[in-house]
Curated annotation (Swiss-Prot):
Organism of derivation: Homo sapiens
Segments forming domain KRAB: 4-77
SUPFAM superfamilies: beta-beta-alpha zinc fingers (SSF57667), KRAB domain (Kruppel-associated box) (SSF109640)
Subcellular location: Nucleus
Stated family: Belongs to the krueppel C2H2-type zinc-finger protein family.
GO annotation terms (biological process): regulation of transcription by RNA polymerase II
Keyword Membrane: no
This protein's name: Zinc finger protein 555
Function comment: May be involved in transcriptional regulation.
An example Gene Ontology molecular-function term: DNA-binding transcription factor activity, RNA polymerase II-specific
């Protein structure tokens, strides 16, 4: 046997199997198949395509290819469509009987090879099949692949890479994670997920890619016309497959179902990400902090947290971003587009994922459950954050003060305490903030938005803290009642905290003294009693505080701000606790009476005032009995 047939070394999928692959898997398939074809088409200058009429290299390439030419010359200078088309048109089968089983009425494999390549402009679906014959040059030995009778050649060397698709043998193993592959090209592409190598750069926007097919696919975003338009929302796409995937956001179709838990997904990529939650596999490990990740994309995002790189820059305002997703979110702030609207409350969203998460607020769905304590969560990030409270894992450590954090967002926020960075700026007044939530709260002072409304009196508030303070002014409004002791509360969170007193559930334990707490915030406050840490410093007088809430209250002493005003007499106070104590003068009955004296006429509103009064009376008595 003196020939190698392309189908012998190619991996093909049925139409049903091909539909299950996502874009990344299809790109990988094309890269490997194109590389295989290149190896077959340009092994040597003596190699020819054996067919009726003897199609030579000169017939295919249009010129004689020199011996030192590399495979890259084939792909760079010659159109795929012209090369493959000439091969297909000129090939004739010498032995129809031996190859009858290989003939296909339509070769879907070639369509897939050229699906993402801009050079394949011609339609090749009419070409019946590909049968590349290699004439073995003189002096080259034949190496028979015994299992299937395939013959391979390698000039002046032995066969180094036998075909292993059929046997399942995977001789090429990754030294980082141990994953094995049947082809060396597969391994090379996989290694890039560990070292972060992305050698293919888009000249238009500078974005990098690990594979040429991914780059070609991306370039179409800049150059190709979006001819496939969604009739429901008007959004346009480059190819039909992207439109098909998008339509599922309208129809709600979820064809990918997990066999483990029965959960269904609209996209194959989301389905594969979900399956890893069952296996727990985390092959991508960070060498800086030893944190492991299940997905290469998450791993790359994490690595940027160490380097601080911000390659994505907005041309409108100049703001730079570390992640493309954050950059895309920012760009929509300029356009203001929010295509996803909630039918329940009318709220609109920029992203489909945000819209779906919002829907859980109405449905009450909490799909993420903690196996240790049974607590359920709406969002996966909330679930992961909660899991770390049990394990005590804190991989993010501050180099300046040694404080460790469970989450990168908390770590970045803490670093701003040292650097003084306030990246979130109000465009209306120029005031800057450490956290985005602080900026959002501040923006309500300009927009006059007051989303928190009191059901008792109808008064609205812009901040939840002010709303809770106000609710306490209505003592009869306690709709959340404990079924065990009958105690009532203003909000369900207070009731949940109270219930742990009955169950004695204290999940959060101090490692230094063993004391346990019901809530992680209480544990954090307790830990500071051991460290005596006071990270919050007043820039005016240098006074330091343990808690972030204490610093703004203290700053009011310097600014003179008194935001809490008494409605009865107009007196103002710099903190809410002082206002509450003052309000008792107008509303509360004086329940504490002094029994010392004749008659016991002194009355007080609180026990602390009564004790202070009794101490003063005791000192007077002692001075009378024991005169100096």
């Amino acid at each position: 046997m003196d020939s190698v047939v392309f189908e012998d070394v190619a991996v093909d999928f049925t139409l049903e199997e091909w539909a299950l692959l996502d874009s990344a898997q299809r790109d990988l398939y094309r890269d490997v198949m194109l590389e295989t074809f290149q190896n077959l088409a340009s092994v040597d200058d003596e190699t020819q395509f054996k067919a009726s009429g003897s199609v030579s290299q000169q017939d295919i390439y249009g010129e004689k290819i020199p011996k030192e030419s590399k495979i890259a010359t084939f792909t760079r200078n010659v159109s795929w469509a012209s090369v493959l088309g000439k091969i297909w048109d000129s090939l004739s089968i010498e032995d129809q009987t031996t190859n009858q089983g290989r003939n296909l009425s339509r070769n879907h494999g070639l369509e897939r090879l050229c699906e993402s390549n801009d050079q394949c402009g011609e339609a090749l679906s009419q070409i019946p099949h590909l049968n590349l014959y290699k004439k073995i040059p003189p002096g080259v030995k034949q190496y028979e692949y015994n299992t299937y009778g395939k013959v391979f050649m390698h000039r002046r060397t032995s066969l180094k890479s036998p075909i292993t698709v059929h046997t399942g043998h995977k001789p090429y193993q990754c030294q980082e994670c141990g994953q094995a592959y049947s082809c060396r090209s597969h391994l090379r592409m996989h290694v890039r997920t560990h070292n972060g190598e992305r050698p293919y750069v888009c000249k238009l926007c500078g974005k990098t890619f690990p594979r040429t097919s991914s780059l070609n696919r991306h370039v179409r975003i800049h150059t190709a016309e979006k001819t496939y338009e969604c009739k429901q929302c008007g959004k346009a796409f480059i190819d039909f497959s992207s439109l098909t995937s998008h339509l599922r956001s309208h129809t709600g179709e979820k064809p990918y179902k997990c066999k483990e838990c029965g959960k269904a997904f609209s996209y194959s990529s989301t389905f594969r990400r979900h399956t890893i939650t069952h296996t727990g596999e985390k092959p991508y490990k960070c060498k800086e902090c030893a944190e492991a990740f299940s997905y290469s994309s998450t791993f790359r995002r994490h690595m940027i947290s160490h380097t601080g790189e911000k390659p994505h820059k907005c041309k409108e305002c100049g703001e730079a971003f570390s992640y493309s997703s954050a950059f895309r979110r920012h760009m929509i702030t300029h356009t203001g587009e929010k295509p996803y609207e909630c039918k329940q409350c009318g709220k609109t969203f920029i992203y489909l994922q945000s819209f779906r998460r919002h829907e859980r607020i109405h449905t009450g769905e909490k799909p993420y459950e903690c196996k240790q304590c049974g607590k359920t969560f709406i969002y996966p990030q909330s679930f992961r954050r909660h899991e770390r409270t049990h394990g005590g894992e804190k991989p993010y450590e501050c180099n300046q003060c040694g404080k460790a954090f469970s989450h990168p967002s908390s770590f970045r926020g803490h670093m701003r305490v040292h650097t003084g960075e306030k990246p979130y700026e109000c465009k209306q007044c120029g005031k800057t903030f450490n956290w985005p939530i602080s900026l959002r709260k501040h923006m309500r002072t300009h927009t006059r938005e007051k989303p928190y409304e009191c059901k008792q009196c109808g008064k609205a508030f812009s901040l939840s803290a002010c709303f809770r303070e106000h609710v306490r002014m209505h003592p009869e409004d306690k709709s959340y009642e404990c079924k065990l002791c009958g105690k009532a509360f203003y909000c369900h969170i207070s009731l949940q905290k109270h219930m742990r007193r009955h169950t004695a559930e204290k999940l959060y334990k101090c490692k230094q003294c063993g004391k346990a707490f019901s809530w992680p915030e209480l544990l954090q406050q307790h830990v500071r009693t051991h460290t005596v840490e006071k990270p919050y410093e007043c820039k005016e007088c240098g006074k330091v505080f343990k808690w972030p809430s204490s610093l703004p209250i203290h700053m009011r002493l310097h600014t003179g701000e008194k935001p809490y005003q008494c409605k009865h007499c107009g007196k103002a106070f710099n903190c809410s606790s002082s206002l509450r104590r003052h309000v008792r003068i107008h509303t509360t009955e004086k329940q504490y009476k002094c029994n010392v004296g004749h008659p016991p006429a002194n009355e007080f509103m609180c026990s602390a005032s009564e004790k202070s009064h009794q101490e003063r009376d005791l000192i007077k008595v002692v001075n009378m009995v024991l005169p100096l």
